[in-house]
Amino acid sequence: MAGNAAVGVLALQGDVSEHISAFESAIQNLGLNIPVVPVRKAEQILDLMALAIPGGESTTIMRLIEKNGMRNIIQNFKGGIFATCAGMVVSARDLINETRFTPLDLLDITVNRNAFGRQRESFEADLQISGFDTPFHAIFIRAPVITRAGPDVTILAEIPQGIVAAKKGKKLILSFHPEISHDLRMHEYFLKDMLG
């Protein structure tokens, strides 16, 4: 574990308050005492045990990561990474049909940023997630999918269009928005996996 055992939520754009609330509830459910903090400055990342990269608009998030001098710090961060939707996009090694920015290469994955096109911008699905006893009701909003995962990446859930949940070590990458689903299992899974 790195630094001062806090979970940070990248607070540049996206579902920041929803992730903070979900992590606080998950931490309480697990009987842990870990603070959850918004992260707006690069130096804050150094003191974290985990960093959440929330959904939002991937081009904007990446531009703000660059502007705030966070790229190298996030790429070299040894704690956990919890990335959702646009967070998945910026965490990828490669992107399909996206040349406006270079992603962070946190996992050996290729991501299709607009996998469902404009006609299916938002939908919900009950996912069978590896290790979960019952389906997880996932909310997808203009969601990306993983089209290729490297051999060191564990696939946790798929739909016909591609992979929607994957992990490598302490990094958990999701296409959907668990922070708005009222089901804390993804946040709890991440915390338990990271602390285990």
Swiss-Prot record:
The active site is at residues 85, 177, 179. Pfam families: SNO. The keyword Lyase applies. Keywords: Glutamine amidotransferase, Hydrolase, Lyase, Pyridoxal phosphate. GO terms for biological process: glutamine catabolic process; pyridoxal phosphate biosynthetic process; pyridoxine metabolic process. InterPro entries: Class_I_gatase-like, PdxT/SNO, PdxT/SNO_CS. GO terms for cellular component: cytosol; glutaminase complex. GO terms for molecular function: glutaminase activity; pyridoxal 5'-phosphate synthase (glutamine hydrolysing) activity. Pathway: Cofactor biosynthesis; pyridoxal 5'-phosphate biosynthesis. It catalyses: aldehydo-D-ribose 5-phosphate + D-glyceraldehyde 3-phosphate + L-glutamine = pyridoxal 5'-phosphate + L-glutamate + phosphate + 3 H2O + H(+); L-glutamine + H2O = L-glutamate + NH4(+). Gene3D superfamilies: 3.40.50.880. L-glutamine binds at residues 56-58, 113, 141-142. The keyword Lyase applies. Its EC number is 4.3.3.6, 3.5.1.2. Belongs to the glutaminase PdxT/SNO family. In the presence of PdxS, forms a dodecamer of heterodimers. Only shows activity in the heterodimer. Catalyzes the hydrolysis of glutamine to glutamate and ammonia as part of the biosynthesis of pyridoxal 5'-phosphate. The resulting ammonia molecule is channeled to the active site of PdxS. This is Pyridoxal 5'-phosphate synthase subunit PdxT. The gene is pdxT.
